[in-house]
Amino acid sequence: KKRRQRRRAAQAVRLIKFLYQSNPPPSPEGTRQARRNRRRRWRQRQRQIRSISGWIISNYLGRPAEPVPLQLPPLERLTLDCNEDCGTSGTQGVGSPQILVESPTILESGTKE
């Protein structure tokens, strides 16, 4: 089953790569208006390719192309807890996030420089 998943992922990547390669950036020749029109059409094709790529990913791999957004409390209530090794090399991003929902006094105290 894993081999089949890898093969389908490789197919999806090849298809998406082919789509992007089939739409090279527009040439810089011609009048300003012609260049503008070519760029506009190129951007429109890029948007279509992006949506088709999302469809390919969701159908080939069985998952949405975009990650589900993380629900956070209002910004005013978020503070960072740096009491423990904040950003020690090798440990960044490891473990559970240290987000506390408290008063914003910690953020205000760091404004002096």
UniProtKB/Swiss-Prot annotation:
Record keywords: AIDS, Host cytoplasm, Host nucleus, Host-virus interaction, Methylation, mRNA transport, Phosphoprotein, RNA-binding, Transport
Biased composition (Basic residues): 33-45
UniProt PTM comment: Asymmetrically arginine dimethylated at one site by host PRMT6. Methylation impairs the RNA-binding activity and export of viral RNA from the nucleus to the cytoplasm. Phosphorylated by protein kinase CK2. Presence of, and maybe binding to the N-terminus of the regulatory beta subunit of CK2 is necessary for CK2-mediated Rev's phosphorylation.
Pfam family, any one: REV
Motif annotated as Nuclear localization signal and RNA-binding (RRE), chain positions: 31-47
Keyword set includes Phosphoprotein: yes
A GO CC term attached to the entry: host cell nucleolus
Any Gene Ontology biological process: mRNA transport
Residues covered by region (Disordered): 17-45, 89-113
Domain of life (superkingdom): Viruses
Notes on the domains: The RNA-binding motif binds to the RRE, a 240 bp stem-and-loop structure present in incompletely spliced viral pre-mRNAs. This region also contains the NLS which mediates nuclear localization via KPNB1 binding and, when the N-terminal sequence is present, nucleolar targeting. These overlapping functions prevent Rev bound to RRE from undesirable return to the nucleus. When Rev binds the RRE, the NLS becomes masked while the NES remains accessible. The leucine-rich NES mediates binding to human XPO1.
Note: HIV-1 lineages are divided in three main groups, M (for Major), O (for Outlier), and N (for New, or Non-M, Non-O). The vast majority of strains found worldwide belong to the group M. Group O seems to be endemic to and largely confined to Cameroon and neighboring countries in West Central Africa, where these viruses represent a small minority of HIV-1 strains. The group N is represented by a limited number of isolates from Cameroonian persons. The group M is further subdivided in 9 clades or subtypes (A to D, F to H, J and K).
Assembly behavior: Homomultimer; when bound to the RRE. Multimeric assembly is essential for activity and may involve XPO1. Binds to human KPNB1, XPO1, TNPO1, RANBP5 and IPO7. Interacts with the viral Integrase. Interacts with human KHDRBS1. Interacts with human NAP1; this interaction decreases Rev multimerization and stimulates its activity. Interacts with human DEAD-box helicases DDX3 and DDX24; these interactions may serve for viral RNA export to the cytoplasm and packaging, respectively.
Function: Escorts unspliced or incompletely spliced viral pre-mRNAs (late transcripts) out of the nucleus of infected cells. These pre-mRNAs carry a recognition sequence called Rev responsive element (RRE) located in the env gene, that is not present in fully spliced viral mRNAs (early transcripts). This function is essential since most viral proteins are translated from unspliced or partially spliced pre-mRNAs which cannot exit the nucleus by the pathway used by fully processed cellular mRNAs. Rev itself is translated from a fully spliced mRNA that readily exits the nucleus.
Protein name listed in UniProt: Protein Rev
Naturally occurring in which organism (per UniProt): Human immunodeficiency virus type 1 group M subtype B (isolate JH32) (HIV-1)
Gene that encodes it: rev
